[in-house]
């Protein structure tokens, strides 16, 4: 059990590092690493509704667009402040991940942080976690509250 928790922690540490690297100027985007983090199909649930998709060419194209959006609003880093792993069964866990999105607002140079929590459902086969579902809060609302959009 401890090894699985450590694997999930390392998985999200790598995920955060890839995200922060993609916010640098110039960006270093590890698209293959992001793609490899997800199962062949995955589901997102948010206040906008539930969406599902294939981990395929369209997803691969959307990744750099998402990072570009975060850079446009002043994103500088994606940091993990906590990870709590809940065992579901022998092959699946839920990870509650507390994130800190650090930014410098383009319009006035003010620095700040958007804190939020995502819940990820991961399937672990041969020690390799893959995200097959996640629940996220209202990202657009949080960005509006911080004057980023």
Task: Label every PLM stretch briefly.
Residues 2-6, 29-91:
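A solvent-exposed, acidic/Ser-Thr-rich amphipathic alpha-helical stretch
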Residues 113-148:
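Short beta-strand edge/turn micro-motifs at domain boundaries
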């Amino acid at each position: 059990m401890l090894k699985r928790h450590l694997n999930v922690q390392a998985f999200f540490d790598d995920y955060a590092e890839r995200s922060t690297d993609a916010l640098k100027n110039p960006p270093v985007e590890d698209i293959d690493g992001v793609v490899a983090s997800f199962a062949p199909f995955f589901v997102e649930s948010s206040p906008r509704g539930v969406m599902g998709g294939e981990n395929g060419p369209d997803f691969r194209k959307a990744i750099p667009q998402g990072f570009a959006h975060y850079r446009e609003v002043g994103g500088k880093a994606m940091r993990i402040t906590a990870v709590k792993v809940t065992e579901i069964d022998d092959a699946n866990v839920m990870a509650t991940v507390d994130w800190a999105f650090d930014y410098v607002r383009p319009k006035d140079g003010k620095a700040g942080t958007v804190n939020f929590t995502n819940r990820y459902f991961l399937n672990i086969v041969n020690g390799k976690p893959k995200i097959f579902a996640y629940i996220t809060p209202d990202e657009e609302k949080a960005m509006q509250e911080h004057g980023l959009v």
